[in-house]
Amino acid sequence: MEAPVTPYIWQYQPETGTAAGARQNYGAVINWLSSDNNMYHRVQEVNRQRNKIDDFREQTVRADMAHSFNDWKPQQLSQPASTAYLPAPNPIAGPRTIPDVIFTAEGEQLAGASPSLLSGGASLPPSSYRLGDGREYRKFTRDAMPFPHNWLVKENGVWVPVEERDPLLSEEGRNALSSYPTLTYAQPPILRYRRLGQQLQGGGVVAPSSRVVSLLTEQPRMPRTEGMTPYQFSAEFPPVVYDHPFSRNLTLFPKEFSPLFDPKDQVLATSLATLQYR
């Protein structure tokens, strides 16, 4: 008795860090057909678009989310436990687990000063920050704009806007993706665009418009040219099987079902109908 067909499983090549396909006898089950990772990710994107409707409806009826990120309390914007970036710990809450100052290729992180103590043991948020240049900085608005937007520097006991007093950290030195200062001295792009981890950016308002964008995480913006790790392989090349791929008109049959499909070699436009298989 012939064994039933199994999913088309991509094989990981540890020597080269690439994926290779496995041959299967799909004649055993005529309504089964597998796909490469290109089709898999396209189907996943369709599912995400479908879920956006319910996700948006849920957000608009929740009182704690139906407003701007700028109105959230600091406790609501804490980093998830699995993120690589950890904020500087509160010296009053307990022993330090990481340094308060993290040095990067772009200068020192704004780690923050010690909170002000109040009667009864309460504390206030840090009133100012230090860059390591002997001056104090503070932000006078609660927004997610990058440094030095809406930042003040203390000079001779007076708080003045950074953009007016320090051209080095002004228009030519700001970084649109980070709240950290960017120095203007020459450095390789791989260092200039390196990030410590996830950050909350953007306006973040929940509105019935697809033009509202909030950057909650940062990922590499350059295509991967080198090999991948076994973890990346397991996340990007899962076993995939599609049921009844021939249930529609064959003129809409997607080339992505073929393990040999390469988008660069496909000259015909792909319509939305090719993604509507059940």
Curated annotation (Swiss-Prot):
The keyword Phosphoprotein applies. InterPro entries: Adeno_PVIII (IPR000646). Coiled coil: none annotated. Keywords: Capsid protein, Host nucleus, Late protein, Phosphoprotein, Virion. GO terms for molecular function: hexon binding. Cleaved by the viral protease during virion maturation. May cause the middle segment to be shed from the capsid. The keyword Phosphoprotein applies. The record marks A113, S114, Q199, L200 as: Cleavage. Induction: Expressed in the late phase of the viral replicative cycle. It comes from the Viruses. Residues 114-199 form a propeptide. GO terms for cellular component: host cell nucleus; viral capsid. Interacts with the peripentonal hexons as well as the hexons in the facets. Part of a complex composed of the core-capsid bridging protein, the endosome lysis protein VI and the hexon-linking protein VIII; these interactions bridge the virus core to the capsid. Belongs to the adenoviridae hexon-linking protein family. All late proteins expressed from the major late promoter are produced by alternative splicing and alternative polyadenylation of the same gene giving rise to non-overlapping ORFs. A leader sequence is present in the N-terminus of all these mRNAs and is recognized by the viral shutoff protein to provide expression although conventional translation via ribosome scanning from the cap has been shut off in the host cell. This is Pre-hexon-linking protein VIII. It comes from Snake adenovirus serotype 1. The lineage of its organism: Viruses, Varidnaviria, Bamfordvirae, Preplasmiviricota, Tectiliviricetes.
